[in-house]
Amino acid sequence: PADELFGRRHTDSVASRSTEMVVHGISMGAATTMMVSGEVEHGQYQQPFIKCFVEDCGYTSVWDEFRGELKAQFNLPAFPLLHTANWLCRQEYGWDFLEASALEQVKKCTLPMLFIHGDADTFVPTWMVYPLYEAKPEPKELWIVPGATHAMSYKDYPQEYTEHVKKFVGKYIH
């Protein structure tokens, strides 16, 4: 995406050899964080200053998220609507919903990742964090936030959230 490329160029221009960076995203930002986490070439990240990732309530894939929302919001099955929309996306834009898979990207991630998800999230259902966590090679940590709905973990538990993130990040940023 253009914003990711801009971010890379901008970061490259301000980063020095001593720069240490955490990529942290919530909701769509979490999905983007996980997508970026798998962008490696020859086993190396293009940005060596990235030290770890924190994702908060990201989805497994666009397909899974759309399928879940069709069911939850409209009580509709994936077929034929999602299949048709996927076909149209492939025709018009050259990619499909199955390609936008954070699950596939985290499998390639070699850097540490903290997974955060509210146990009351129904927009990006809590179940999605478990296959993501299982797919990600070590090092990794998981924090399920009791009672938190979608993207509300920090708002509901600001002190605990900050402590979890600082403790995790502190292992990798010096």
PLM region descriptions:
Residues G25-G29, T33:
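Gly/Ala-rich beta-loop-alpha elbow adjacent to hydrolase catalytic centers
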Residues P1-V14:
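Alpha/beta-hydrolase active-site loop
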Residues D119-V124, A151-M152:
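Acidic catalytic loop of the alpha/beta-hydrolase fold
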Residues Y133-A151, H164:
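Catalytic histidine neighborhood in serine/cysteine hydrolases
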Residues K108-T110, F115-H117, D121:
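Short beta-strand/loop motif that positions the catalytic acidic residue
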Residues D156-H174:
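Catalytic active-site module of serine/aspartate enzymes centered on a nucleophile-bearing elbow/loop
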Residues M35-L98, E104:
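Hydrolase active-site cap/lid region
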Residues A102, L111, P125-E134:
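Short alpha-helix in the alpha/beta-hydrolase fold that links the catalytic acid
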